[in-house]
Amino acid sequence: MRYTVSAPASLHAAIQLPASKSISNRALILHSLAHGNILPRNLSDCDDTIVMTRALDGNPGHIDILAAGTAMRFLTAYLSVTPGTRIITGTQRMQQRPIRILVDALRELGARIEYVGNEGFPPLRITGTELTGSEISLAGNVSSQYISALLMIGTVLPKGLRLHLTGDIISRPYINLTLQLMRDFGAQADWVSEDCITVSPGGYTDTPFTVESDWSAASYWYQMMAIEGIKNEKIKGGDRSSAKESEDSTKEEAHTAEIELLGLFAHSYQGDSRGAEVFTRLGVHTEYTDRGVKLTRKGTPATRLDEDMVDIPDLAQTFVVTCCLMDIPFRFTGLQSLKIKETDRITALITELRKLRS
């Protein structure tokens, strides 16, 4: 099937963004550990959150999380501290994604977890029990979802949790997001040094909570604004016509183009909000309003973009494609986690961009 996609004459829109998946999935775990009756409002409708909601509803004995990596990690820890014996599995790709680091850490705390298939990979058989351990060490360069999974169950452990992180700590904003949400639900949890987090025992409080809009989803609208100046260039067979031909006809529209993204905040919990600052270097101006953010084009894009993406790995694909479309050379580092996502995102990027001869 083939589609023809045409740019609008001018770019003006007010967009209601989807709710944050990262916040939704954490809020659901915290809500369940609080034995809450008040379901968080404005939950994401993405597959990951739907899978998480179903898994937490009714305590099934067999849980298929499909391709939802976040659900696999968070639920592995959650099931370790809640009553019952459950098998958790996923797609064939999910069964190729390693989980040994998290399982070993949970076992060190006293969890009862068995591998049903290949050692170190899902599926898992988990029997919930009271975890007697309270202190563990973990490499700081592992997936932040492992760290978040452990932190969220920390306050329901009899002695709480003291988590030491060794080496470089990647995706620190996602760890901070987890800690902030835990505090919103009544837990005492914080950094006590640059590499150590403590979580006090005591459990969670059932708390009314509304999920904010998703900064990751916002990145695609930032991308549209960034490439507004080249929208009349034709991309066909990988050959793009000169930007000069469309410069005059698009100059006025580019100047007045405006997108309003509803439900975003300046002081967001989400680490991906940093994307707004990076897009400034690509000519996108962000103005915060009482409804969200307003995007316009302003200034001259950078001639080269060098960025450490270790704290915003989920935005890497957006920036790679944006830079390719804008003919801006770039060098991005800190992308080691992209190879173990639902697919190898680096390989996927290279494969798809080659189709455009990028």
Where in this protein do the model-derived segments appear?
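Short, structured segments at the rim of ligand-binding sites
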Residues: 1-358
